[in-house]
Amino acid sequence: MVLDTDVVIAGLRSPTGASAELLRMARRGELTLLISVPLFIEYDAKCLEKEHLDAAGLTTQDVQVFLDALTVIAEPVSIHFTWRPQLTDPADEMVLETAINGQAKALVTFNQRHFGKAPAAFGIELLLPSEALRRLR
């Protein structure tokens, strides 16, 4: 499963939400998260933005610990093939490429409109965090 950056941020900002529960399930080994270097770099940059730190009530160190843990529990994906352009937003291409190259069954995002039908063309389900959580329970 690949989590779009918006889902990771939601998990930090709302500890009782579906996004946070997906992250906890990954920590417990109940699901496998896939991550590539470009996607992790985006997680790092976005999660450390002041607006997200303030909203989550977290420090930079708190988020660094979280991100370090994420690198331990996530399965690394090497990007052997790029499939660009598939999406209307070029910034989302790395998320889709991680899912394709990692042979993910699902890509979880709040921005489903940005991904359109592209994931389905590669046999990848496009899910909201709440949908992913329901399917895993």
Spell out what each predicted region is.
Residues 10-11, 82-88:
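Short, flexible loop segments at the rims of nucleotide/cofactor-binding pockets, characterized by
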Residues 1-35:
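Short, well-structured N-terminal submotif of metal-dependent ribonuclease cores
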Residues 86, 93, 100-106, 112-137:
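Acidic, PIN/NYN-like endoribonuclease modules and their adjacent C-terminal/linker elements
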Residues 7-8, 39, 113-114:
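Alpha-helix capping/helix-boundary segments
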Residues 25-82:
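PIN-domain endoribonuclease scaffold, especially VapC-family toxins
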Residues 12-13, 47, 119, 137:
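Short, flexible helix/strand-to-coil boundary loops that buttress conserved ligand/catalytic motifs
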Residues 22, 95-96:
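Short, hydrophobic alpha-helical packing/hinge segments within bilobed ligand-binding/sensory domains
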